Swiss-Prot record:
It comes from the Bacteria. Keywords: DNA-binding, Transcription, Transcription regulation. Residues 21-40 bind DNA. It holds the Pfam family LysR_substrate. This is HTH-type transcriptional regulator ArgP. InterPro entries: ArgP, ArgP_gammaproteobact, LTTR, LysR_subst-bd, Tscrpt_reg_HTH_LysR, WH-like_DNA-bd_sf, WH_DNA-bd_sf.
């Protein structure tokens, strides 16, 4: 069985994390040539490329598997060393999360762990339909995803659902929907998407109003908080988690344009198995808080 040397594997990890050989060399305090030699050594060991030499470099399928292995080893080292780690450099935990969870429930859920444990978070924001891929590629050790099925050598638990409402300000509704929300009025009302792959708004309109994708004018804004601001100032109508706008709905600053209609996204927590002690703390915190504030039915 081929057993990689973890010093060389850390060179591969650094190239991916630092998005290039030069910065990886600086991170590892070695020469760029030494980084290249270590990766070539790994590739010779496995008889295949581990990096696609693009800008930035990205791991091949085998490279992804090795990076996932490295993540597990790092967490298990923390478990085995236990109290010997006390006072040392905080453990880095890379997690893939969707922007709406980050804007609503995730940080309060992690607050007790962050206050009690020597860890540093590296939160990688990705759409909930794609976060699991980051776990598959070994870029993170845990992911909040809508996928319910666990990857090989991983664990999964249900967190609960975010309910999305179709909302806008009252002046916006009076301007674009004077006779209510209809198929024809929606064609003129500007909306918002997180990125070009975000299909939340389109899926809602297609399901409830039979509008094909791409038929509605749409701003692209990579910020959950900006969705709320755009809706409040009367710039656009948006799909926003109910959890994020409870105060605005109660005050009347925002109104639900389609009462009785919503888009529900069930969320799941994925991570490598076996879990280290630190990851178990993270899991317990996420599940406990998620079960309190997210829909469970």
């Amino acid at each position: 069985m081929k057993r990689p040397d973890y010093r060389t594997l850390q060179a591969l990890d650094a190239v991916i994390r630092e998005r290039g050989f030069e910065r990886a060399a600086q991170k590892l305090c070695i020469t760029q040539s030494a980084v290249s030699q270590r990766i070539k050594q790994l590739e010779n060991m496995f008889g295949q490329p581990l990096l696609v030499r693009t800008v930035p470099p990205r791991p091949t399928e085998q490279g992804q598997k090795l990076l996932a292995l490295l993540r597990q080893v790092e967490l298990l080292e923390e478990e085995w060393l236990g109290d010997e780690q006390t006072g040392s450099t905080p453990l880095l935990l890379s997690l893939a999360v969707n922007a709406d969870s980050l804007a609503t429930w995730l940080l309060p859920a992690l607050a007790p762990v962050l206050a009690d444990s020597p860890i540093r978070l590296n939160l990688q924001v990705e759409d909930e339909t794609r976060t699991q891929e980051r776990l598959r590629r070994g870029e993170v050790v845990g992911a909040v995803s809508i996928q319910h099925q666990a990857l090989p050598s991983c664990l999964v638990d249900k967190l609960g659902a975010l309910d999305y409402l179709f909302v806008a300000s009252k002046p916006f509704a009076e301007r674009y929907f004077p006779n209510g929300v209809t198929r024809s009025s929606l064609l003129k009302a500007p909306a918002v998407a997180f990125d070009h792959l975000d299909d939340m708004h389109q899926a809602f309109l297609q399901q409830n109003f039979d509008l094909p994708p791409g038929s509605v004018p749409c701003h692209i804004v990579n910020s959950s908080e900006a969705f709320v601001q755009l809706a409040r100032q009367g710039t656009a109508c948006c799909m926003i988690p109910h959890l994020q706008i409870e105060k605005e709905l109660e005050s009347g600053e925002l109104i639900n344009l389609t009462p009785g209609l919503l888009q529900r996204r069930m969320l799941y927590w994925h991570r490598f198995a076996p879990e280290s002690r630190m990851m178990r703390k993270v899991t317990d915190a996420l599940l406990e808080y998620g079960h309190k504030v997210l829909r469970q039915d």
